[in-house]
Amino acid sequence: MSAFNEVKKNFGFGLMRLPMKDGKIDNVELCKMVDFFMERGFNYFDTAHGYHNGLSEVAVRECLSSRYPRESYVLTNKLSSSYFKTQEDIRPYFELQLKECGVEYFDFYLMHAQDKRLFEKYKKHNAYE
């Protein structure tokens, strides 16, 4: 079954701009937001390593993946060109993202900020393989 079929409502929770407290992500508030979202039948979440300097992924782990069964939500992450220089850098980066998010897989994995120049970089380093 496609992950598209698992998205319950056509609205997603982007984890790019999160509640802050004392210069850090306010996980207490974020957990409340995640709970509110899930309780209303929404289940699609979107993050990227660059959001909050990698801490958005940690927030996913602390407020979503450690608190809800994996099959209850759909999670998207992204490959950002600034985090790899060679093809060999891509897999360790991907595995770090899985670990930081506390999951074994992503439902969707996007090439972040596509443009012609970055498309060529992704192709050159076999990111589409």
Where are these regions (language model features)?
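N-terminal binding-site loop/beta-alpha segment at the start of enzyme catalytic domains
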Residues: 1-73
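Acidic active-site catalytic centers that drive phospho-/nucleotidyl reactions
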Residues: 46, 78, 107
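Structural motif corresponding to the early beta-alpha repeats
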Residues: 51, 67-87, 112-115
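Active-site mouth loops of central-metabolism enzymes
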Residues: 16-28, 78-88, 119-121
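Glycine/proline-rich, positively charged
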Residues: 35, 85-129
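Proline-rich low-complexity regions
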Residues: 9, 80-81, 100
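Solvent-exposed, non-transmembrane amphipathic alpha-helical segments
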Residues: 33, 62-65, 79-80, 126-129
